[in-house]
Amino acid sequence: MFYPTLDEVKIMAKDYNIIPVTMEVYADMETPISLFKRFEESSCCFLLESVEGGEKWARYSIIGKNPFLVVESYKNKTIIRERNGSQREVEGNPVEIIKGIMGKFKGANLPNLPRFNGGAVGYFGYDLIRHYENLPNVPEDDMGLPECHFMFTDEVLVYDHLKQKIHIIVNLHVNGNIERAYISAVDRIKTIHREILDTRWKTADNSVLSYNKKKNELAVTSNISKEDFCRNVLKAKQYIRDGDIFQVVLSQRLCVETNENPFNIYRALRVINPSPYMYYLKFGGYRIIGSSPEMLVRVENGIVETCPIAGTRKRGRTKEEDEALEKELLSDEKEIAEHVMLVDLGRNDIGRVSKFGTVAVKNLMHIERYSHVMHVVTNVQGEIREDKTPFDALMSILPAGTLSGAPKVRAMEIIDELETVKRGPYGGAIGYLSFNGNLDSCITIRTIILKDGKAYVQAGAGIVADSVPEREYEECYNKAMALLKAIEEAGEIR
């Protein structure tokens, strides 16, 4: 059965210009992984998943392919590619260009569907801030990736873990004959359903994760030596003593040569380090694979929310050691001072787009546990103003204070001085912009970028007045550990 009906669509078309048409099918013999592997050969596709509390899969996994637009931006040039093969270039602020494209769509919000049922999926890079702030000391761009890259998709598969069903969603564009468009959407749903049922996929790939203790140790290189990183920490501490900043986040980029199957790396990562934001994004010649624990900003039903994370410890080997490390973390004056500072920064960022008096702190300084580390986390919420959009909320926070510092602009100037290369996607945002007005994004951390036979992993540490350089250097490696392990484990998938 297809929902909504043609008659219902005709009524909705008076108020909306893009309407999701959906059919539910049983999926008790499928997984999100088996589904996605049917469509991974598409040049641009994505898989979004989520784990709640570090241990329970969230209700929905979302698969997208066959985008009708792909938008990528380099400085002031944005390339827009259409599904029919045509493309054009537009000059100007890429955020405003994507905002303009999204502004053309007014999507219907149907009940019983997830937050995202069609729209744009991709990333905004850290360096987009240069379109809003004067940061003249631009580091070298050694990776050559777009400042932002988005797939606009009107075909989505939603795997419902609770009901063990798949929502096959095709968005109908209201731009002509409604009946013809509805029939076309229904036909497309039927085609996708046949692809799901195709028995060739049942035996095409029966690879499994097998854990062989004898693994080849990865040859990991960094773009900065330990001595130089520690020297930069001392320089940052001098800026703090001089009163320039209270805190700054310094990072290093690790690199590993690999020829492992990219999707197998994602499969290993989702087992090793399940997180609130799991993503596999395929953009033609490169892929972004991640398990970010940290929300950047979410806008849903008029509520705007951010979730600062600051304060980290390694997980203990036993329950008792784990609890002792939690107690140590929550009594660490340096970590708590840094966290409170970033919560205040989050309140200020949310306040710029929220109604007066609605900004509130929720769940102050609670602990969230992941496979290799634990973090101190706080939620900040507000009611978004009528004159503000989800884009305004996103740009009020990007880049997050937890990846830049405080005050934010001066901290970013110091990052440009001390880090030798542009951050690219790292420290920016990955997420979706839905046709129905919802936005959800995470900070691009705990992320692997695969390009030209190399895997890049970037991680940082928050520097404050009493930081110990060697400990900050080690924190970067602690944060990268799960990602490097996933690359190792991918080689064990047989």
From Swiss-Prot:
Catalytic activities: chorismate + L-glutamine = anthranilate + pyruvate + L-glutamate + H(+)
Name of one Pfam family that matches: Anth_synt_I_N
UniProt pathway: Amino-acid biosynthesis; L-tryptophan biosynthesis; L-tryptophan from chorismate: step 1/5
Residues at which L-tryptophan binds: S50, P276, Y277, M278
Gene Ontology process terms (BP): L-tryptophan biosynthetic process
Cofactor annotation comment: Binds 1 Mg(2+) ion per subunit.
Regulation: Feedback inhibited by tryptophan.
GO terms, molecular function: anthranilate synthase activity; metal ion binding
InterPro entries: ADC_synthase, Anth_synth_I-like, Anth_synth_I_N, Anth_synth_I_PabB, Chorismate_C
Enzyme Commission identifier(s): 4.1.3.27
Keywords: Amino-acid biosynthesis, Aromatic amino acid biosynthesis, Lyase, Magnesium, Metal-binding, Tryptophan biosynthesis
Residues where Mg(2+) binds: E338, E475
Enzyme class (EC, first level): lyase
Cofactor: Mg(2+)
Keyword Protein transport recorded: no
Top-level taxonomic group: Bacteria
Binding positions for chorismate per the UniProt entry: G311, T312, Y426, R446, G460, A461, G462
Family: Belongs to the anthranilate synthase component I family.
Function: Part of a heterotetrameric complex that catalyzes the two-step biosynthesis of anthranilate, an intermediate in the biosynthesis of L-tryptophan. In the first step, the glutamine-binding beta subunit (TrpG) of anthranilate synthase (AS) provides the glutamine amidotransferase activity which generates ammonia as a substrate that, along with chorismate, is used in the second step, catalyzed by the large alpha subunit of AS (TrpE) to produce anthranilate. In the absence of TrpG, TrpE can synthesize anthranilate directly from chorismate and high concentrations of ammonia.
Subunit relationships: Heterotetramer consisting of two non-identical subunits: a beta subunit (TrpG) and a large alpha subunit (TrpE).
Name the record gives this protein: Anthranilate synthase component 1
Taxonomic source organism: Acetivibrio thermocellus
Gene name of the record: trpE
